[in-house]
Design a protein with these regions (language model features):
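Conserved ankyrin/ankyrin-like repeat signature
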Residues: 55-56, 89-90, 127-128, 174-175, ...
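Ankyrin repeat domain, specifically the short helix-to-loop turn at the C-terminus of the second helix
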Residues: 30, 59-66, 92-103, 130-148, ...
């Protein structure tokens, strides 16, 4: 499970940031990026890094008054600026002249933890990635914890924390392989416990995500782990497979299903497949795919019920158990409603007494019997049984609804 201090620290950071920045999120972002541009134009080293002016960068680095660790509005260094602008020559000059910047993270609340390598892999600049790694760029340790990259409602992106997950979301297979070869763990998890596969399931470009899933799973299989990567749960107990079902990502779900199937035989257009129902069937799994679909609020998740083998499994369960269970409940409910209706129809009434006070508009001819008059005859006792059944049935229905 996720550590409590980590969650408290995340919540406190968000609360502190919102108290310090009482403006709207979008307005605050606009102001921050305007300040970022202003800093670039005012700080000579930043400006030359943005303009890719190698000669000026070398002169500035040789100047004693130049602070190579100077930060901008985003907490960025000059190397971050060069990498964000995809300026290879400027970035190489900065790495050669100030190698201390290679693993320096951004320090602002928004971009906390972003290293130049994070930016290079997202921009898919393979040459920059190669230069950063060959000069000692750390691919395993850096973690992005800035609020801009947190998963939230209305968020623009969620790439996780680690460099590998950033590379996976970008979808460049050469960069993914390069990062893994440099020592990145395929099983690293972010503050939600999400691995790179979880994060890929949440990406909008499903085709690229599926290709990255295949590559990362293939590289992870080389390590001969006891548990396959696609069965590693996050801190909410969801594997990438279950997360795809919960989010209604049909493409990723079908892709992961197909990776688990076994072809029995093939004859022309006919193919017989065996499907692994682990994580799908609700038998012995309280958080199965079926449970997540039925209990979730995502409408698009219902579409997964049409995907093989979920459709066949639901049909089989309905024919074997569901329809009989439904018919039994329907019968019990009809009996309950019938009993309740009869109790209402034969409620204890008597003729209105002669001294019954009524207005000219009141046409009442029968009134409710007193309690002692209501339960005298055999018919009254039968009605009493029906009333007890009605009350108990109402409590049972209430308890069932509350439990669900």
């Amino acid at each position: 499970m996720s550590s409590a201090p980590s969650k408290l620290n995340h919540w406190w950071s968000q609360l502190r940031f919102r108290l310090q920045n009482k403006k709207g999120w979008k307005e605050m972002l606009d102001e921050t990026f305007l300040l970022h541009t202003k800093y670039i134009n005012e700080v000579p080293l930043f400006y030359e890094a943005k303009k890719n002016n190698v000669n000026c960068i070398k002169k500035l680095l040789s100047c004693a008054s130049t602070n190579i660790f100077e930060r901008g509005a985003l907490g960025e260094t000059a190397l971050h600026v060069a990498v964000m602008a995809d300026n290879l020559e400027a970035a190489v000059a900065l790495m050669d002249g100030a190698p201390e910047l290679i693993n320096e993270p951004m320090t602002s609340e928004l971009f906390q933890g972003v290293t130049p390598l994070h930016i290079a892999v997202v921009n898919q600049n393979i040459n920059l990635v190669h230069h950063l790694i060959s000069r000692g760029g750390d691919v395993a340790t850096p973690r992005v914890t800035g609020l801009y990259f947190r998963k939230r409602i209305g968020g623009l992106l969620y790439y996780g924390e680690h460099i590998l997950s950033f590379a996976a979301c970008a979808g460049n297979e050469d960069i993914i392989s390069m990062v893994i070869d440099a020592g990145a763990s395929t099983r690293s998890q972010d503050y939600r416990g999400n691995t790179a596969l979880h994060i890929l399931v949440l990406q909008p470009n499903k085709t690229i995500a599926c290709q990255a899933i295949d590559l990362i799973m293939a590289r992870d299989a080389e390590l001969d782990q006891s548990v396959p990567l696609d069965r590693v749960p996050n801190y909410r107990g969801l594997t990438p497979f279950k997360l795809a079902a919960k989010e209604g990502n049909i493409v990723a779900f079908q892709h992961l299903v197909n990776k688990r199937r076994v072809v029995q035989w093939s004859l022309g257009p006919l193919t017989s497949n065996l499907y692994d129902l682990t994580e799908i069937d609700s038998w012995a799994d309280d958080m199965s795919v079926l449970e997540l679909i039925v209990g979730g609020h995502q409408r698009k998740a219902r579409m997964i019920l049409e995907v093989t083998p979920v459709r066949q499994l639901v049909s089989l369960k309905w024919n074997l158990y569901g329809k009989h269970y439904f018919r039994l409940l329907l019968l019990l409910y009809l009996l309950y409603i019938g009993t309740f209706t009869l109790c209402c129809a034969f409620r204890p009434l008597k003729d209105a007494p002669e001294n019954y006070t009524q207005s000219e508009m009141d046409k009442t001819i029968r009134v409710q019997k007193t309690f002692h008059e209501s339960y005298v005859t055999h018919e009254d006792n039968l009605r009493l049984v029906g009333e007890i059944i009605s009350i108990l049935g109402a409590f049972v229905i209430l308890l069932l609804e509350v439990r669900l």
